[in-house]
Amino acid sequence: MKLNRYLDHTLLKPEATEQQIDQVVREALENHFYSVMVNPYWVKHVHAQLAGSDVATACVIGFPLGANTTAIKVAEAKQAIADGVDELDMVINIGELKGDHYDAVQQDIESVVTVGHTADKVVKVIIETALLTDGEIVKASEIVADAHADFVKTSTGFSTRGASVHDISLMKGAVQDRIGVKASGGIHTRDEALAMIDAGATRLGVSASMAIIGK
């Protein structure tokens, strides 16, 4: 297993400086991580350094609350694509999910998926498992698959907890092999990373990438 190719090397802290972003980019290039995941402001800067490499440029959309209007999420996605992004990790409208307004949740996702897929970009969808019941995790995962996104993702890393093996098992059970499953938030060691993969995760969002690969 090439564990490094499971990793989205992530720096989403609001106080992240250009110097810190550049360090993450260097680490990703040296270790061939799957992508560098940043906030939208940094996409153009990161893409300029990663273009032509085997490391993708990724960013978050509607982050971290997911409570933006769909139009704003779409505009943010379009800007990121113009700036050179390869993968978009959007946050669902969590309140609408918990309010059982499933059509609204799916339409919000589909709008970003359409923009992403039209430009041949990967779209991952964060459901924020920390705020959901088991039943809501399953339902949200099904909605994400029905919206034709590429991955369902556990967490922003900004809520009450990150991913758990239980979350991943529920999500994988819901989507089977229809779409990928991404675990993110609170994964700090190789053993934790492998446990997520064993449970069904096909991508990991981590800031502790260097520790996970033993560097």
Swiss-Prot record:
InterPro entries in alphabetical order: Aldolase_TIM, DeoC, DeoC/FbaB/LacD_aldolase, DeoC_typeI
Single GO cellular component term: cytoplasm
Keywords: Cytoplasm, Lyase, Schiff base
Top class in the EC scheme: lyase
Pathway in which the depicted protein is active: Carbohydrate degradation; 2-deoxy-D-ribose 1-phosphate degradation; D-glyceraldehyde 3-phosphate and acetaldehyde from 2-deoxy-alpha-D-ribose 1-phosphate: step 2/2
Reported function: Catalyzes a reversible aldol reaction between acetaldehyde and D-glyceraldehyde 3-phosphate to generate 2-deoxy-D-ribose 5-phosphate.
Family named by the database record: Belongs to the DeoC/FbaB aldolase family. DeoC type 1 subfamily.
HAMAP family referenced in this protein's UniProt entry, alphabetically: DeoC_type1 (MF_00114)
Name of the protein described by the UniProt record: Deoxyribose-phosphate aldolase
Organismal lineage: Bacteria, Bacillati, Bacillota, Bacilli, Lactobacillales
Gene: deoC
